[in-house]
């Protein structure tokens, strides 16, 4: 699986066991990603932070 880094077009190949790409954004600025990368379990979103997870190449 390949996931985008914080600044596209850079990306990285995920290590074994981390089979989701994720993007973390602040709810007040949803178009500005704070973090991107590979993860094993999608974290729950909160009042301030929103997580978007997916399982295809460079979908974050």
Curated annotation (Swiss-Prot):
Provide the GO MF annotations for this entry. toxin activity
The record, for Pfam families, names: Toxin_cobra-type
Q: Which InterPro entries match?
A: Cytotoxin_Cobra, Snake_3FTx, Snake_toxin-like_sf, Snake_toxin_con_site, Toxin_cobra-type
Record organism: Naja mossambica
Name of the protein: Cytotoxin 3
Tissue expression, as annotated, is: Expressed by the venom gland.
Q: Which family does it belong to?
A: Belongs to the three-finger toxin family. Short-chain subfamily. Type IA cytotoxin sub-subfamily.
The disulfide bridges present are 3-21, 14-38, 42-53, 54-59
The domain of life is Eukaryota
Tell me a GO cellular component.
membrane
């Amino acid at each position: 699986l390949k996931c985008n880094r914080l600044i596209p077009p850079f990306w990285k190949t995920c290590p074994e066991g981390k089979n989701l790409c994720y993007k973390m954004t602040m709810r007040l600025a949803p178009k500005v990603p704070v973090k991107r990368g590979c993860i094993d379990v999608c974290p729950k979103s909160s009042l301030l932070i929103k997580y978007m997870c997916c399982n295809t190449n460079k979908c974050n």
